[in-house]
Amino acid sequence: MKKGLIALAAVGMLCVSALGADAPKAPAQKPKTAAKAASQPTLPKPTMEDVHYGPHPKQVMNFWKAESDKPTPLLFFIHGGGWMGGNRTSGLGGLLQEMLKNKISVVSVEYRFIPEATADGEVPPVRGPLHDAARALQFVRAHAAEWNIDKQRIGASGGSAGACTSLWLDFHPDLADPNSKDPIARESTRLWCAAVSAPQTTLDPQQMKEWTPNSRYGGHAFGFKGDKEKKLSQFDEFLAKRDTILPWIAEYSPYALVTSDDPPVYMIFSSPPALGKDQKDPTHTANFGVKLQEKCKAEGVPCELVYPGAPDVKHPTVSSYLIDKLKAEKP
């Protein structure tokens, strides 16, 4: 029980740090004291650092190789931050240590944020960070033999926007192009599983509003900026123009992509759900988890949902789920 409470507290901290575009900029903070700095997890040095999987300066990853004489499973970590901030070490901390201790290698990826994707001509902008993650996954698989990785047993994880990206990978049809001249593009983008913290499970503003009336997140993913003169918020514009972007929602919203052949998923939230009611943190509400779990159950996709007071909790933490799934005996 204590372990579960600690895990939920960690999810809460992750949500605060991963608000990204949803939150106003905080005032400049004073430098951390030595005591606070000492409390931050110290990450082991990567086996390989700043490995480029693409030409953009942000298309890089770190790789930590688990000690093993046979190919290891892999945690594919995607940091949060609203696709607007954060870096490849954000939120990785204790999860990295747990994986390495259990002979699971780890990759953590950097990717283009919404402004960078927009500058590169990605339409809609969210295509940039999502397809960067897919390309990074293919890159890892292309180097599986060299890095001693079991290319089948790859589980994705992350918080907030990184969690949304992980679920998108989990549910999206394979992006592999078997006829490509590029050997990396021939690799699969399918996962073994995904275990995420506080994900946004839909990018459909109408669903968000129905599930959580005070929703306000997601418009930036599709290039909406609102209009201050008209007192039109980013989300208001997103909702008003929803019908013009239905094909984008169908392609980039995790909820819309769920089908019966998808890998299993796990979600953890720091507060219990309250469907149809305003939430203190509508961007990271467990309402997202409840509705995705309903969809997964209807499609026959295994889906575990954890929050304070949740019934039938099998795995109290992301790490416990990943270790169980990635290290399970082959049938």
Place the predicted regions along the sequence by residue.
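N-terminal cap/lid segment of alpha/beta-hydrolase-fold proteins
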Residues: 29-69, 259
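Mobile cap/lid helix-loop segments that gate and shape the active-site cleft of serine hydrolases
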Residues: 40-45, 56, 175, 205-257, ...
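C-terminal catalytic histidine-bearing segment of alpha/beta-hydrolase fold enzymes
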Residues: 62-64, 265-280, 284-331
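Short substrate-entry loop that stabilizes the transition state in hydrolases
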Residues: 69-72, 80-118, 164, 176-177, ...
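Structural cue for short, hydrophobic secondary-structure segments
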Residues: 77-80, 108, 139, 267
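Catalytic nucleophile-loop/oxyanion-hole region of alpha/beta-hydrolase
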Residues: 87-88, 95, 107-151, 312-313
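Primarily recognizes the serine-hydrolase "nucleophile elbow" in alpha/beta-hydrolase
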Residues: 135-213
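The feature captures the conserved acid-bearing segment of alpha/beta-hydrolase catalytic domains
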Residues: 180-213, 244-279
